A protein has these predicted regions:
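Short, Gly/Pro- and small/polar-rich lid/capping loops
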Residues: 1-7
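Metal- or metallocofactor-binding catalytic centers and their adjacent structured scaffolds
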Residues: 7-69
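Hydrophobic faces of well-ordered beta-strands that scaffold small-molecule active sites
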Residues: 16-18, 83-89, 110-114, 137-143, ...
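N-terminal small/glycine-rich loop or linker at the start of catalytic domains
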Residues: 67-91, 134
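Short, charged beta->alpha transition segments
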Residues: 69-75, 94-102, 127
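Active-site-proximal, glycine-rich beta->alpha crossover segments in alpha/beta enzymes
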Residues: 80-113, 120
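Catalytic core of soluble alpha/beta enzymes
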Residues: 120-207
Length: 207
């Protein structure tokens, strides 16, 4: 993957850093976005999702450093004290997932992000994968909206929650379905994670 690193230097000398994956997020940070942010108070532009992930991340980083406060305090309440180091792979037969995870564990990774897809038997896959990885190793199941709606996603995820190594449901249904995601959040014990760009980030953290 190609990464774009963004560095913001404030008038007080504080430096904020962010990153973009140009072919995975919504593209590179443009010169126009840099011009819009340049010379502005960072807190006045850091909520502008159109700036691009790397620049927006760098602005949050700079504001947090200037206030001597962690970025989570700018977003809301603290929800975790650490983050897993994740290994990523696409949807594939469970035998291949097991091989991927064996290599991930060998290299020191602590979680496995993969694609939950309806053309595989997810319950069988998650059961066999859970048995194959150590107790500290967690699973992040990314549906990319393939759960379709709460009526389908809720019972499936509830059945999969019996496997305690499942740590995250990522985009189980369309992220724009705010009420549907609220319903899932109310009935599922495993947290739901979303990409930060849709719906608007302010909508995500408020609702």
């Amino acid at each position: 993957s190609l990464f774009e690193l963004c560095k913001v230097t404030l008038s007080n000398g504080v430096v904020g850093v962010g990153e973009t994956m140009p072919y995975y997020t919504w593209g590179e940070v443009t010169d126009e976005a840099v011009d819009r942010a340049n010379g502005k108070h960072p807190a006045s532009v850091m909520w502008d999702d159109s700036l691009g992930a790397g620049l927006q991340m760098a602005l949050f980083d700079a504001v947090g450093k200037s206030l001597d406060t962690p970025v989570w305090a700018l977003l809301g309440r603290k929800v975790r004290s650490f983050a897993h180091v994740g290994w990523w792979a696409i949807d594939m037969p469970v035998e291949d997932w097991i091989l991927e995870c064996a290599e991930a564990v060998k290299q020191g990774y602590t979680t496995f992000k993969t694609k939950a897809r309806p053309w595989f038997d997810l319950e069988d896959q998650v059961a066999r994968l859970s048995d194959a990885v150590p107790d500290h190793f967690k699973l992040d199941m990314d549906f990319n909206d393939f759960g379709l709606d709460p009526a389908i996603a809720r019972p499936l995820c509830k059945r999969l929650e019996q496997f305690k190594k499942v740590a995250i449901w990522e985009s189980p249904i369309a992220q724009e379905d705010v009420e549907g995601n609220r319903t899932l959040r109310q009935h599922l014990s495993v947290p739901i994670a979303h990409h930060i760009d849709r719906p608007a980030f302010e909508t995500q953290i408020r609702r």
